[in-house]
């Protein structure tokens, strides 16, 4: 098993257990404890895990972005449930904005089953996946984000998106506060989502429970600005909102 594959599997296991010992990871992966320790040291240096005496857990800091290959393992079962609920709100012939989040990628995996959908995305991974199927897909172009290698950002991306109007915008963020505000730590990605939100008739936020009751650096939007929030937890009591029907439990 290559180093990158080991690191992906470590993150996947920690996503399931929240906390694990070196011995547990060694046994589950059939890899020596010394190799596990080296991998954990590298992951900690990259800000992806927190080590303590005898154990390790995923870092919770919202100021750092976990690479897409690892984020796609985080809460993957919950994200797939959320994606199914989101896909049910997308209809034949819809034009769909997808952002570069791992949550939106799981929605992309379901779109080939919906007839006549057109997708506009700044996600390299989503565009690559959809290119294998009969789904009309437009990749925005732009600069590869230095922080999140899986998405395209910058002025060219924004100019492209401003010229397009969609039926649905599907997106996620890093943090959602109790007062209904959404946040992310990267200004470039916030700017892109702002255009998607503005130019879509219907807006869907994908929000697994790990994002709740948190804030990050840059304000993105408010629940008042969107039609649906889909989560793996019941949000009717989380938000003080007079329109609870916008919250969908996946």
Regions found by a protein language model. Give the residues of each.
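Conserved SAM/SAH-binding loop
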Residues: 104
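Conserved phosphate- and dinucleotide-binding cores of soluble alpha/beta proteins
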Residues: 2-5, 12, 19-23, 30, ...
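Glycine- and other small-residue-rich loops at beta-strand/loop junctions that grip anionic moieties
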Residues: 75, 96, 119, 150, ...
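HTH-adjacent hinge/linker in prokaryotic transcriptional regulators
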Residues: 2-9, 13-28, 34-100, 108-116, ...
